[in-house]
Structure formats: structure tokens, C-alpha cells
């Protein structure tokens, strides 16, 4: 069994990250610059996002280098975060890492959704909101069936996190959605 932990800018916890890294766990960046840039700059179309891609990439590289400096970790395998804005745009954050030049500049070996990362898994499941709990299969059933290797994606907020953290994040999402729906100046 091997685990990796990816931290967003908004969820990074220096103490936890250091403890995990010292224990030999892979710790890296859970990035979301594309969605964040689109929301901050009121972009509503993939074309507008593509036009801004050089700025988005620069922000991503800057954030990644800052995390590497702060934690002294290679962070050369990164993981894209999914946001409501990505679903609206039909454009995942990982679009950033499709650029080989960016990968070279940023020192990225792979992104967790790259084919070479996903292909070895016989099955890949993700936790989901109750009452479903699992998307793409139940890991307990897959283990009993002898499915191996198995990739399992989990999110702390779906299992046991501090209620105020979840409430705060939900409040931000609602505010963003209302601004998006009723705000002026979206491109």
C-alpha cells in the first residue's frame, strides 16, 4: 500500500506536510490555478481562459516554486483539483500540464491523471458525497474480488474533517456561485 497526499493552497498545513514527508510519504501540490484565475478574472468561456493561459501558467509555476522553497520537497508529481468552475468551463485544471514546455520549466514529471499514472490501475475509485460514498466502484468489494492494483482517491472533508472548515468552504462556494450567476462583467 502506498499513499500520496496533495495539498491545495487553501488547505495546506505545514505541520502535517512536514510530518508526512518525514515519514516518507509523497507530499505534493493539488493545484487549481485555472479555475481560480477564471473566477478571479470573471472568465466564462474556454476561449477566454486559453487567451489567459500564459498568465495562469506563470501563477502555477510561481505557486509551485514557492511551495518547494517552503517545504524543501521535490513536488514533481502534481494533482489537479476539480472545482465547479472547471465543470462549468468543461476544462479541467490539468489542461495546464498538457504543455510540455510548462512541465519542463516547472520540473514536473507527471500529473496524477496522466495515462502512464492511471494505466497500471486495474480499477480506480473515488469517494463521493453521502449517501453514495463511492464513485466508480466500492473499494471494499474490489479488494474482496482480488482487484489489484487499486487506485483510491479520498478527500478528508468527506470523511472526518472539522465542521467549521467544511462550512467555511461551502460558504465560499455559494458566494462564488452567486457572484458568477448574478455578477456583472463576466467575459
Predicted feature descriptions by range:
Residues 1-4, 11-23, 34, 39-187:
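Terminal accessory/targeting
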Residues 26:
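Hydrophobic "anchor" residues on beta-strands that sit immediately upstream
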Amino acid at each position: 500500500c502506498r499513499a500520496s497526499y496533495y495539498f491545495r493552497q487553501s488547505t495546506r498545513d505545514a505541520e502535517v506536510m512536514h510530518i508526512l514527508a518525514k515519514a516518507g510519504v509523497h507530499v505534493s501540490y493539488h493545484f487549481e490555478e485555472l479555475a481560480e484565475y477564471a473566477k478571479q478574472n470573471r472568465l466564462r468561456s474556454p476561449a477566454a481562459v486559453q487567451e489567459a493561459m500564459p498568465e495562469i501558467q506563470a501563477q502555477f509555476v510561481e505557486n509551485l516554486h514557492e511551495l518547494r522553497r517552503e517545504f524543501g520537497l521535490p513536488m514533481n508529481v502534481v494533482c489537479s483539483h476539480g472545482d465547479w468552475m472547471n465543470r462549468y468551463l468543461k476544462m479541467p485544471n490539468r489542461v495546464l500540464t498538457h504543455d510540455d514546455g510548462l512541465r519542463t520549466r516547472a520540473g514536473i514529471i507527471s500529473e496524477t491523471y496522466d495515462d502512464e499514472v492511471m494505466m497500471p490501475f486495474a480499477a480506480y475509485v473515488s469517494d463521493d458525497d453521502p449517501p453514495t460514498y463511492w464513485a466508480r466502484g466500492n473499494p471494499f468489494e474490489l479488494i474482496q474480488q482480488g482487484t489489484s492494483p487499486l487506485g483510491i482517491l479520498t478527500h478528508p472533508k468527506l470523511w472526518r474533517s472539522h465542521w467549521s472548515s467544511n462550512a467555511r468552504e461551502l460558504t465560499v462556494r455559494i458566494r462564488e456561485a452567486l457572484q458568477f450567476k448574478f455578477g456583472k462583467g463576466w467575459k
